[in-house]
Amino acid sequence: VKLQTQLTEMAREASFNLVGPNCMGLYLPKVGVRFNADAPVADDGKIGFLSQSGTHGIMFSLVSAANGMHVSRCASFGNAVVLDVSDYLEYLMLDDETEVIGMYVEGVKNGRRFFETLREACKRKPVIVWKGGQTEAGARATMSHTGSLAAPQAVWDGMMRQCGAITTNNLDETLDVMKLLLNTKRPRGNGMALLAQTGGQSVSITDAFAKAGLRVPRFADATYTELGEFFNIVGGSFQNPLDMAGTIQGSMDTLDRILRILDADPNVDAMAMELSAMFAARQWKGKPETLDKTIEEIALHKERSKKPFLVILHPAHEAEYVASIQPKFHAANIPLFQSFERAAAAFARVLAYGGS
């Protein structure tokens, strides 16, 4: 503490913008400044990330890249004795290369300035705030970690709502929200069309999205009429949700037909589709072109539609294989999730942001 005090006084006397201490510093991939040798060097980053934790800063830079999203700039600022989170946030909100801002923060030095800066930043671009120390025990941990005195959670939550920030609880939720912000159209409503491969999964995906506060409405009469012309109801259903594996049977023309019909439905604001590794992996492995055609069809639909579209691909027993094909989805800018619950939670957060 004594050394930190001396360092702070020296920096302020010299008008020196000190990062940290107790941090990893700056990650600037475009110019090759990295936290470690594993961090990618890229010039197409769109995410600005701020972290009071060095580990979370490193983890975010690595895992976001593994999910097809690159960082424009990242600052690990630790104890923030000279430059605080508000200084970095102010920079990122004015940075043309940064489209989305995320942060992990345990506490702030100047609450009023942070509130005003965050509110202005949220007017310019989406800001996702992952707060550390949300519980009494967690707040004690932040004090020993970065010396941050956490504000009461109710006060913090109220400030986030007033500013229009998107709040998350962990790294996965933060990344999931960013997938949608960077790779889908903005939602205009909460009416979901849900497309599953089997009956059981159609129930599970419906429960997941309904529990997240999203609607699974009846389709318009015209939609039922059009689907009824060709849909196989033996072991399937074209209610909402759809149980459609027996109808599609690997035909991209049929999938395209279904997607076009649902896209035209006025009751549908967005679509979420399950791809089943449990059933499809064998075919994709044997005929890789079938996977490529599936991704191409989804990408084409996503491009022509004005409605958000997301894909859920549970690894099942094919975790290693699914991990190997994820870059194909990322390259096509398809937001890919490994569970119904994560997809639903992310969509609900982005929808709430759009309505704030």
Regions found by a protein language model. Give the residues of each.
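Catalytic-core regions of core metabolic enzymes
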Residues: 1-356
